[in-house]
From Swiss-Prot:
Belongs to the bacterial ribosomal protein bL9 family. One of its GO terms (biological process) is translation. PANTHER family: 50S RIBOSOMAL PROTEIN L9. This is Large ribosomal subunit protein bL9. The keyword Ribonucleoprotein applies. HAMAP family: Ribosomal_bL9. PROSITE patterns: RIBOSOMAL_L9 (PS00651). One of its GO terms (molecular function) is rRNA binding.
Length: 152
């Protein structure tokens, strides 16, 4: 049975673990790949103490980010309705469609806060009217906004 060595990861390693994880790996894998490329360090009491401090700091940082997302969610709900103006033809059919970029621009205009368009899930919109749109603000925080599509 082969001996395994314990290392602490300095960064996320695919199929092995995340930054700060204590993992057991084959000695050759540690010696030839993880340690030389700075992806891990051998386990010592000092390293374990550092990992504890780093995890506490990361937890604080994540809590602050989540609180910021919750505050932004409250702001979105308070505003309530966002409007996107699009050119229409007969029977209020849009020329083109409403994209997540259009919604992001409407949110940025109303809130003065930048949001990544990739975090907005827009249903297929081809007519004027009112629609529900999902906005992902954080891994654990989502907001549902009302989008009003009007013609100009």
């Amino acid at each position: 049975m082969a001996k395994r060595v314990q290392v602490v990861l300095n960064e996320d390693v695919l199929s092995l673990g995340k930054d700060g994880d204590l993992v057991e790996v084959a000695p050759g894998y540690a010696r030839n790949f993880l340690l030389p490329f700075g992806k891990a360090v051998p386990v010592t009491p000092a390293v374990m103490k550092q990992v504890g401090h780093r995890r506490a700091k990361q937890a604080e940082h994540q809590a602050a980010i989540k609180q910021e997302a919750l505050d932004f969610q409250t702001a979105l709900v308070t505003i309530g309705r966002f409007t996107v103006k699009k050119q229409t033809g007969e029977d209020d059919v849009l020329f083109g469609t409403v994209t997540n970029g259009d919604v992001a621009e409407a949110i940025e205009t109303a809130t003065k806060k930048e949001i990544d368009r990739r975090n907005i899930i827009v249903p297929e919109i081809h007519r004027t009217g009112s629609y529900k749109v999902q906005v992902k603000l954080h891994n654990e925080v989502n907001a549902e906004i009302n989008l009003e599509v009007v013609s100009y």
